[in-house]
Amino acid sequence: MKRTDLLAMLDLTLLDRNASEQDIHRVVGLADEHGVAAVCVFSEQAGLASKQASSRTRIAAVAGPFPKGAADLERYLLPIQEAIAGGAVEIDLVLEPGIGLEASMMVLNGVRMATEGLALKVIIETPILDERAVRGAARMALMAGADFVKTCTGRRGGCSKEATRWVSEEIRRHEVTTGERAGMKLSGGIRDLDGLNGLLDVVRSVDPGIIDQGRLRIGASSLIESLI
């Protein structure tokens, strides 16, 4: 793929609660210059990023507890409101493994309602899950209306080819079953073109439409250096 096409899929990420105004300005400047899909920051930084970004750069915000999620819906709602007030049009959040089916669906349904009209990306932390758990988490997220299933936070392991395949297959299964076309966000330790291309090959082997139809995002902080 052309590097410009890869840049157009990139969620350029700065997840540092201590990031300075200059740090955010630098990342937003890179995003504006190179036409990435979005800038991804924490919810409390969305307002600053939005003020500095051009109209073509979308602001995505990680809302709620991170990198570990929670079973308490309330811990997500105020950060979501803060992100939206700051100008975020996309929300990333963690579905914490091990909280149980009932709590998971309560969180997912609640955050979907709170983000109506925005792109919702649900992080399912594939590095600490086996195949059955990855597929189950992806199915729950898709059933609740997630626009993207994101492979991991990157704080508890990286994105593997195996997990990439499992999530891709669940997105395809969801489309075949419901007719709904969801997306996928590859994230976690993606630092160079070789690593990225290996994951893209897996996605393409399962369902090229995820890539060709603009339903793929790449979450990374340093990958941009390999693309510009």
Describe the function of each predicted region.
Residues K2-H34, E44-M184, L193-E225:
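Alpha/beta enzyme core
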Residues A38-V41:
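Short, hydrophobic beta-strand segments that form beta-sheet elements in well-ordered domains
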Residues I190:
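Short donor-sugar binding/catalytic loops of nucleotide-sugar-dependent glycosyltransferases
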